[in-house]
Amino acid sequence: TPIIVVSSNSEQKHRIDILKQSVEYYIKKPVNTQYLYFTIKNLSRLININRRISPLTGLPGNVQIHAELKKKIANKEDFSVLYLDLDNFKAYNDVYGFLKGDEIIKFTADTIMKCVHSYIPTNAFIGHIGGDDFVAIVPTLNCDEICENIIANFDAQVTKFFTEDDVEKGYIEVANRKGVIEQFPLTSISIGVVEADKGRFANILEIGEVGAQVKHMAKS
């Protein structure tokens, strides 16, 4: 809920002190009721938008992802949906911790955006489903080069998040629940692609069903 302070004190120091207290807006008396109404309305709209954005990556979340897919279907466009997620990411978190894991998530988001926009500067949508799951919606049915570029860039740079020893070995070691040491390859990225030819899908549920299948195949 946005906090708005209405005060008759016009001193600049007072206004600054108020805004330091996590207050969203300061209004000096006398107050125009119409101005106050639209201030509250606009602040509420911005807060609702921010709630739909991943605080970690700054990418739109599921609400906007679903809206984008519905729009593509309604407009009868040709498009593809790239489902991207990380392999062996849980093992990485277990060894390096969640803060380092967050760094890889942000790196993944940046890599996807850079690679997708290098091929499709406009009209490409990139979203963060949650955790290490991402989606890219692109206006083309041929995504091979985009996917290859994402994987190549990811693999070339992800090693900076590992120790030299782990990079040299090519794997990390994690104790399972029974205390047995297991080896996991360095974190990589998998991409499953759903080609949505014009009229192929009637709704986003159908896309989701095929998406689950291609994600499974990509990780196999």
Give, region by region, the residue ranges found by the protein language model.
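Alpha4 helix (beta4-alpha4-beta5 surface) of REC/receiver domains from two-component response regulators
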Residues: 9-25
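Receiver (REC) domain switch/output surface
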Residues: 36-47, 68, 72
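Conserved long alpha-helical elements within nucleotide-processing catalytic cores of c-di-GMP signaling
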Residues: 61-80, 90-114, 127-131, 135, ...
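A short glycine-enriched loop-to-beta-strand structural element that forms part of the catalytic core
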Residues: 128, 162-213
